[in-house]
Amino acid sequence: MGKKKYTFREFLASQIESGKPVFFDGGMGTMIQKSGVVGYAIPEDLNFYHPEIIEDIHIQYMKAGCNVLTANSFGANPIKLEKSAHTAEEYVTKSIEIQKSAIAKAEADGIEGPHFSSWDTGQIGKLLEPMGSLTFDQAYESYKKVCVAAEKAGADLAIIETMSDLYEVKAAILAVRENTKLPVVATMTFQENLRTLTGADVLTCVTYLEALRPDVIGFNCGGSLEEGAELTRQFLRYAHLPVLVQPNAGLPQVVDGKTVFLVEGDEFAEAQAKNRKEGAVLLGGCCGTNPTHIRAMVERILKDESSACDKSCGNSSGEGKEEIPLTDGVNATYVCSYNKSQQIGGSFGPVIIGE
């Protein structure tokens, strides 16, 4: 009898219950550049012109130990690709088909799973009102078209990543939740001051995102590993949902006219092992990371946990978390706007909010 086929939600719940992590893959753009392929207008073109390259990237990440694959569909939305060779829906469908093929080949070759196919999307590429001219409804419809295509193609979950505008991430999450049954992973990206481009801090992001009811929240991209460590601590301080941590391989540097990331696999693994001990459930990599970084991360974390692991590793159920007094502000109730949050209740007296 074969192994049980988990849904992503079932697998995540099982890992949290048993105090085990979930591993995501690393950079896609990093690997495309490393392949040396040229002659494409956008990375998503390779889904049609060189699907074997994208499939091999997925297989390399599965060999490195990841559970969740990220589709080559980051920029595939109808607004951004209005004048491209294929529709956004076609790019997305092809990206999921490549993932499914890669998973089938990897598991047939004995690469241990489970493995999950994810539709991946980033920002649309235009600012929403009031900072830009794109309306909320236009953003919603754009995300709706491609997430529906992803589900039809067989995606196991949706990853909404590298978001800097909470208004836009709201459009994306609602589009997925209202039009598909896909689990939702939503991650923000932060500047050096630990705020998004539109000014929201971690507490505001957590408050806002959790109200939209995704399955997982967290951050990706950003700056140094030290900044990533502080973001991890802040997310885990306030979040009630599982947290995904996907930092870059450090800050990019220009060497001989080329942009490179100098953090090697062992250093990346060390940083992620610390983030895991803080309580992160889901871990992966972003810009500059490759299968070497992911393999080092997986091996280091599994080695650490084989010698000393307890159920306080998870952060979604509250088990193992230190009880913090309400007056500390962590277990309090918050309301938030676009880029600000306000604690209410507790021993702070009445709060008057003018809008």
Description of each model-found segment:
Residues 1-355:
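Domain-level signal for soluble alpha/beta catalytic cores
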